[in-house]
């Protein structure tokens, strides 16, 4: 009974969520698009001509937002080819419905074959921005969940170290709680500028926050 009440309450909140309504109205696949939008407007992360990689992209709302931001002229419909000033590459283990002007690679970005596809698309250019809204399946066991979250952040950090240009940026989703301070320290070890962002589009009850790292430190 308690579970049914929880599900009913969640569904009620979801249906009445202004960001859910806005996403439906503006054609975004998830309300998460507005989290990236708010952070981008604050930090001006997405700019014309960039190479952007979206790790764990499914269902695709972050790639949609990035695509719309880079769209040429008045072409802002993410479901229609219109050309963009830049390159967006989305990666996920799960399949993703196509997004106009976004190249999708299905597979594990830790695998050489997937990285090979990415490097072929990027060519001699380095990546300007890595974004990741990845989150593990949470078990409710704090220690186990913290380890899973930290692991995903480690993967994004490693990917950025290998592919990000010197003045590039990495934005990842994290959660306040056990292990959070360790993740921040890892960012500080790798980036000159580190900041935490809690967009208004994040649900009030959620402990999620986003960590932004800018300007890679040169290896010692």
Curated annotation (Swiss-Prot):
The keyword Hydrolase does not apply. It is an enzyme of class 2 (transferase). GO terms for cellular component: cytoplasm. Its EC number is 2.1.1.166. It catalyses: uridine(2552) in 23S rRNA + S-adenosyl-L-methionine = 2'-O-methyluridine(2552) in 23S rRNA + S-adenosyl-L-homocysteine + H(+). GO terms for molecular function: rRNA (uridine-2'-O-)-methyltransferase activity. It is found in: Cytoplasm. The keyword Aminoacyl-tRNA synthetase does not apply. This is Ribosomal RNA large subunit methyltransferase E. Keywords: Cytoplasm, Methyltransferase, rRNA processing, S-adenosyl-L-methionine, Transferase. The gene is rlmE. Gene3D superfamilies: Vaccinia Virus protein VP39. The active site is at 173 (proton acceptor). It comes from Paraburkholderia phytofirmans (strain DSM 17436 / LMG 22146 / PsJN) (Burkholderia phytofirmans).
